[in-house]
Amino acid sequence: MKLWLPILLAVFVIAAVPVAEPPVWKAGAASAKITPEKAMWMAGYAGRTKPSEGVELDLFAKAFVLTDQAGGRFVLITMDLIGVPRNLRLAVAERVKKEHGIEPANLAINASHTHSGPELRTSKIHGTDDLALREKEAAEYTAQLENTLVRLVGEALQKSVPAHLDYSTARCGVSMHRRTPDGKGGWSNFPNPNGPVDQTVPVLKASSADGKDIAIIFGYSCHCTTLGHQKFSGDYAGYAQQEIEKAHPDAVAMFANGCSGDQNPYPRKTMELAQTHGKSLATSVQAALETHMQRIKGPIRAAYREIPLAYDKLPTREQLLEEQKSTNTWQVTHATRVLQRIADEGPLSTTYPYPVQVLRLGNDLTWVTLGGEVVVDYSLRLKQDIKDPIVWVSGYTNDVMAYIPSLRIWQEGGYEGGGAMIY
């Protein structure tokens, strides 16, 4: 009996060891620096009067490729930039399909919306002495960016290995509603602690079969506007990614901005605050990683539509000519630009091809991406209406053309409710 006792104990010990769950995905990620190599005009603030003056924090583009057991794929690209020009998305999607067989519906490109990155869209510039130079620099940068994004997708595919995918969530208090009644029937851009927010931090981690980190993808609904200086920087989102990659050196950290149209980080204005906000967000991500994360299964299902979103009212020629007499330089620029477009291309379109995309991972996670500067009402409403276990909502994806107000904000007016269109 004494001889059998060690054998029986060994059998029980072996039986008690859990069987490792085999990976059901393949995943890979890649990253590249996209900081301009020379001074450029910066995007985000209309009041800037000169080009950039150095680098505070490098800008990055990153790609994540997920493959299910049936060979279905999904690609997420994130960028430390103001937005996603429509033509860039179309060009990258076409090349990714041609080179890798991935359908455009299965590609999402999200911008962090940092206001400390290079100018990509020059269509709203008019009448400046250096217009031709600014257009040339923006076009050259965007062409180089296109090549980088396509290359990153290929690198992420090459690096793909069998992987697990896990999800959790946390909260972060950096954001605050930024629309405050001005006492005169309007709205000012000012912190409003009583306004709606979505301070959820969704986190998706891809790891290899042996537990090595591949990618840590996280989201948050907040403008990247802590900073207002003349140096390139990813703002708080860039610092958050930096902190996560320090703590997880094998991982590519990727930030997907949410519905941030009416959300700002507070307090603002200094590099130290951007770093503090970034560390706060990174701490929330780490908290999510330390929970009992939910294992995500496949398959991948994705859908993409460009809906004909109708404009409210198109300006008449008479209204535009009257606007050209304004003392507001931006109104004059807006009117002149629209008149020139009518002269070159004919009548204005009555609709805009607005991108809406849905990614579903099995029956576990539904990720909705929307174009433009979407206000937080959309995130809150979609999470309420969609009954799936996990709902993740991102704005600033596939095209960033304008603010997208909710009906409430449209009726209230103000900057996000139509006032920003001249910029």
Question: Which functions belong to the PLM regions below?
Answer:
Residues 2, 7-23:
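Bacterial Sec-dependent signal peptides at the C-terminal "C-region" and cleavage site
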Residues 21-110, 114-252, 256-276, 289, ...:
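Conserved beta-alpha junction segments in alpha/beta enzyme cores
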Residues 281:
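Anionic-ligand-binding alpha/beta catalytic cores of soluble enzymes and soluble regulatory domains
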